[in-house]
């Protein structure tokens, strides 16, 4: 594919999204996110050769929220391997991202690492043997390394906002603790969790960080192997089946790519062998996924023939 076609397609989609009035609703249960301008939109595609096609607010940082769960899972698998799956499953939940219902039925084992309970369990594993500040520093440095950008930071105002209002997450963590799923003090685990969800990145930085997932675990520009090809495929499989809460099936149906959303309005998507894609629009749909983000990605895969299920 020519870079001219990619640039033109991204620019056209960004222009189309800017003109739409159906933008969804910003997350209002996290006070800092409720203040975000709903008119924002950014899109970045980085192809296998490292060419960057950007449109809209491509360099405006936003709160990545649950997209961080892809990277904490990657770290945890590197530390503990398959022991991760003793704490968390690999099945779609079919329920809201902060639901406690399945934890009650399944003795505190979360369905997958991308719902809140699952990500808290994964965070607890990363924290084990470390102080919270050390674990959080490891996560942040990993993100900076993947994006090749040491300027990536944590938005402390967002983290504090989540800590003040994250009662449902506290309930999830305490419930898992009662079943012995968490090893560390709940307050420590939640502190690290809230802070890695509050990492702020632009679409450009996020697409760069996700490149290893599009290329069999390897960054094609640096040649660095982040994970094995098999592990990259398995992370992508989980992103496809579980990456969008109870909207994962709809995303797979319409977009046809592995992806992970966050309530900050971002989506990281992977076109295996082709590109890493990041889109941001803060208005959400009923499942907590970016409304225009999904529409933009559907348009992108249709026009470029990138769905993993065929043209």
UniProtKB/Swiss-Prot annotation:
Per the record, the domain of life is: Bacteria
This protein's UniProt keywords: Hydrolase
Q: Name one GO molecular function term.
A: glutaminase activity
Task: Please give the positions of the paired cysteines in each disulfide bond.
Answer: none
Is Hydrolase tagged as a keyword?
Answer: yes
- Identify the EC number(s): 3.5.1.2
Catalytic activity from the UniProt record: L-glutamine + H2O = L-glutamate + NH4(+)
Specify whether Oxidoreductase is a keyword of the entry.
no
How does this polypeptide assemble, per the annotation? Answer: Homotetramer.
Write the protein's name.
Glutaminase
Q: What is the organism lineage in this UniProt record?
A: Bacteria, Pseudomonadati, Pseudomonadota, Alphaproteobacteria, Hyphomicrobiales
């Amino acid at each position: 594919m020519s870079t001219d076609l990619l640039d033109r397609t991204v620019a056209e989609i960004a222009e189309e999204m800017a003109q739409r009035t159906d933008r969804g609703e910003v997350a209002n249960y996290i006070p800092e996110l409720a203040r975000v301008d709903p008119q924002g939109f950014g899109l970045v595609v980085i192809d296998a050769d490292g060419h960057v096609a950007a449109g809209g607010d491509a360099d405006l940082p936003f709160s990545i929220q649950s997209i961080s769960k892809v990277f904490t899972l990657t770290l945890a698998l590197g530390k503990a391997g398959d022991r991760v799956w003793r704490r968390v499953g690999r099945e779609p939940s079919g329920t809201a991202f902060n639901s406690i219902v399945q934890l009650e039925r399944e003795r505190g084992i979360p369905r997958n690492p991308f719902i809140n309970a699952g990500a808290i369990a994964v965070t607890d594993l990363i924290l084990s043997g470390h102080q919270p500040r050390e674990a959080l520093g490891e996560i942040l440095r990993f993100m900076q390394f993947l994006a090749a950008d040491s300027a990536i930071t944590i938005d402390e105002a967002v983290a504090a906002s989540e800590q003040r209002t994250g009662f449902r997450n506290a309930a999830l963590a305490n419930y898992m603790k009662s079943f012995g799923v968490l090893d560390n003090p709940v307050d420590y685990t939640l502190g690290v969790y809230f802070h890695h969800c509050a990492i702020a990145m632009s679409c450009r930085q996020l697409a760069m960080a996700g490149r290893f997932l599009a290329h069999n675990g390897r960054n094609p520009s640096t040649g660095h192997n982040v994970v094995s090809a098999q592990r990259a495929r398995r992370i992508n499989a989980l992103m496809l089946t579980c990456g969008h809460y109870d909207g994962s099936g709809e995303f797979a149906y319409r977009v046809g790519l592995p992806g992970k959303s966050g309530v900050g309005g971002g989506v990281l998507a992977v076109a295996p062998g082709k590109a890493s894609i990041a889109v941001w629009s803060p208005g959400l749909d009923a499942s907590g996924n970016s409304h225009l983000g999904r529409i933009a990605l559907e348009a992108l895969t249709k026009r470029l023939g990138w769905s993993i299920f065929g043209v």
